[in-house]
Amino acid sequence: MSRELAEWLGHMGIRDRRVLDAIAELDRARFVPPHLVAEAYADRPLPIGFGQTISQPFVVAFMTEALGLDGGERVLEVGTGSGYQTALLARLAGEVWSVEIVPGLAARARALLLGDLGLANVHLREGDGALGWPEAAPFDRILVTAAAPQVPPPLRAQLAPGGRMVLPVGEAESEQVLRVLERAADGIEEIEDLLPVRFVPLTHLPPAV
């Protein structure tokens, strides 16, 4: 079924063969709740608990393709969620750092990604993804899987020269757009908006008191 999903995504316009092959080899059913396994290969988002979703496969593939991975990159993912996107990145990049703010999702992803799948090139952290992972920065690629009103400054600061960030931008209840931010070697940034999207909002930890 994963191979059929990859073929469908190819018909829908995904062209990166490495992305399609990774989707064909990774069983999305492992990342959805048991009662939704029968719907795992449908091209639509599914609830995974805690008010969060696993994104529509086309959007996952589109965002992954937009990163332009060739296999050696250091990637920061903001929002581990189900771990599906993380596992795809692990197959396509050199090393992945992923941050999840929801404790229950973070624990579930850790058990699946590091335990069941044994992904040695994945590092996981429970925390505020909008703050990035400063001690591991800079990153060649940054992928944000929740929408923010603007690019979080800490993430912008952690993007390496020559790097690329892909993220949804917009308010939770208004129009959002998938944006690509590229930083040239000289530090000059180029921004391109790709397509309208709908993501859960990027949440933050409450301030310390």
Swiss-Prot record:
It is found in: Cytoplasm. Its EC number is 2.1.1.77. GO terms for biological process: methylation; protein modification process; protein repair. The gene is pcm. HAMAP family: PIMT. Catalyzes the methyl esterification of L-isoaspartyl residues in peptides and proteins that result from spontaneous decomposition of normal L-aspartyl and L-asparaginyl residues. It plays a role in the repair and/or degradation of damaged proteins. CDD domains: AdoMet_MTases (cd02440). Keywords: Cytoplasm, Methyltransferase, S-adenosyl-L-methionine, Transferase. This is Protein-L-isoaspartate O-methyltransferase. One of its GO terms (cellular component) is cytoplasm. It comes from the Bacteria. It catalyses: [protein]-L-isoaspartate + S-adenosyl-L-methionine = [protein]-L-isoaspartate alpha-methyl ester + S-adenosyl-L-homocysteine. Belongs to the methyltransferase superfamily. L-isoaspartyl/D-aspartyl protein methyltransferase family. InterPro entries: PCMT, SAM-dependent_MTases_sf. The active site is at residue 55. GO terms for molecular function: protein-L-isoaspartate (D-aspartate) O-methyltransferase activity.
